[in-house]
Amino acid sequence: MGFGPWIMRRANKLVSNSSAALLAVALNFLTPLQAAPAFANPLPACQKPVYLTFDTGHMGVAPLIAKVLRQHQVPVTFFGANEKTQEGDGSLGSHWASWWKERGAENHDFASHTFDHAYWRADLDGKRFKIRPSAGDNAGKDLNWGVADYCDNLKKASQRLETLTGRASLPLFRAPGGKTSPALIQAAASCGYAHVGWSPAGFLGDELSSQTHSNANLLKNALKNIRSGDILVAHLGIWSRQDPWAPAVLEPLIVGLQEKGFCFASLRQHPQYSKLLSEVSKTPNMGKMP
């Protein structure tokens, strides 16, 4: 996804003074949020939470990631885009439908990553944006999108995730690469989405070169630097990394953080979003997404 120099604590700026307006718009299209955890045993109260999130990718390590999460009963939030995959017709395609359905049954949470994995490149005049999708029919092309175009791509991913998982998508999104502008954030807020970044220590490094960033060093740095409240980000497969991150790092990272007293929570429990989501879930007669 190309985070590179964009590694920053965007999490501190995710909910602006327009949160009330964001909530009002969210109520117009969110389906009721489902409750009741599906993990085998009740999850303990989380005193030192970290928030593990996964963005889609080539899906080659997706089965392994699911197995580790299930084994350790770790709830996560998946941000979905229909990216090119090693097998099948895209990460949100029919080939992976059963995988997503299983994650929904396990009570993980889901949010938009833009359907076409659409990178923001620049703001243009007239509330428009230079966008370059890395998936879909226009992959690799620079497009001129208005607010409605961007919102449609956000909603398309949310709707597809709902179909695949049987769960309502959260009114959250992560821009590919974390690349945004204030104008893009405002555009997304106008159709009900709050942006989710990640914490500096939460950038787990799975898309960095394995020649310069070994799995052992990535694990060591994560265990050393992650703090309570951090949002962590990894991917369901990175094309460019020769030594895959998840098989070597995910399980020891989870175990190591738990041994240090950390616990895992969904973004549903994050203080920046929990109030918003609580108000959405309590509101009767909410309309469904168009």
What name fits each language-model region?
Residues 54-56, 78-83, 112-114, 175-177, ...:
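A cross-domain feature marking catalytic cores of carbohydrate-active enzymes
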Residues 19-32:
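Bacterial N-terminal signal peptides
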Residues 56-61, 81-95, 118-123, 172-182, ...:
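Acidic-and-aromatic substrate-binding clefts and catalytic sites of carbohydrate-active enzymes
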Residues 37-44, 76, 86, 242-290:
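C-terminal domain-boundary segment and adjacent tail
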Residues 37-142, 153-170, 256:
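Active-site beta->alpha N-cap acidic-glycine motif
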Residues 3-22:
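Bacterial N-terminal signal peptides that target proteins for export
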Residues 179, 184-225, 262-273:
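His/Asp/Glu-enriched short active-site or ligand-binding loop at hydrolase and phosphoryl-transfer sites
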